[in-house]
Amino acid sequence: MKPLSQVIFERRATSHFKPDPVPQEYLEAILQLAGQAPSGYNLQPWRFIVVREKENRLRLQKAAYNQEKIAEAPVIVIAFAIQDDWKNYIDATFQEAVRRGVGKPEMVPQIKEQAAHFLEKGIPQPLWLNRHTMIAVTTMMLAAEAYGFDTAPMEGFDPQAVKKEFGLPENAEVIALLAIGFAKEPDKPYGGRFALGEFVYNEQFGKPWDGNGAAKGPPGKDMAEKIKRRASEKLQPA
């Protein structure tokens, strides 16, 4: 499996896919890793519909402005979340955390109250659901790249049409589509990214980043070894 820095730098959005299937064991591994994404209060609001049957991909294609890659890719994941769904499992989630040694039972009511107040009054739920679900989608995309598959994230679709075609409730938020498979063509050339000084500020907005912003690829071998050494030292018992 590729190192993470290589996965990030080599990932590209694929325009056209081969019809070759994604083996079940790899698909499940990718989905499992996506489910390990972090989320506020560990509420994991993301939900995924895995679409593989040709007729269902064609239905989805119609709801996504007839993008060719939806009909071509062997797997399309519909990423969505449901408003207020967290109320159905917040107790079980916190109880499981306590069972695993995360926190004390007597703290659960207070944490639950904090979470409920935040989700009901502190932030618009669609915004919160989008934030967390996209973390999981990004994790899924990088996991697929690490296993040697190609992906294409998509935001071009009609949410209402997707909900209607795939039986989602009205209070669902359809957040993204992700195609997974094998690219039919070589990756496009690297389109480049902003230098650090163009998107990173030092301590406050408007204060330039004080690095040279020259990094153009994954950390070199020396840097990778240094990071591994630091991680190893950190894990040593005191």
Model-predicted segments: where are they?
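Glycine-rich phosphate/pyrophosphate-binding beta-alpha loops
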Residues: P38-Y41
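Small-aliphatic-rich amphipathic alpha-helix that forms the alpha element of a beta-alpha
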Residues: I30-Q36, V77, R99-R100, P109-E165, ...
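A glycine-rich helix N-cap at a beta->alpha junction
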Residues: K69-Q83, L168-P189
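Short amphipathic alpha-helical segments
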Residues: K2-Q6, Q24-Q32, L58
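Short beta->alpha linker loops
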Residues: V22, E55, F157-D158
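C-terminal helix-cap and adjacent tail motif
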Residues: Q6-V7, A13-T14, A176-A238
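Glycine/small-residue-rich phosphate/adenosyl-binding loop
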Residues: R47-T133
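Generic N-terminal amphipathic, Lys/Arg-enriched alpha-helix
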Residues: L4-D20, Y89-I90
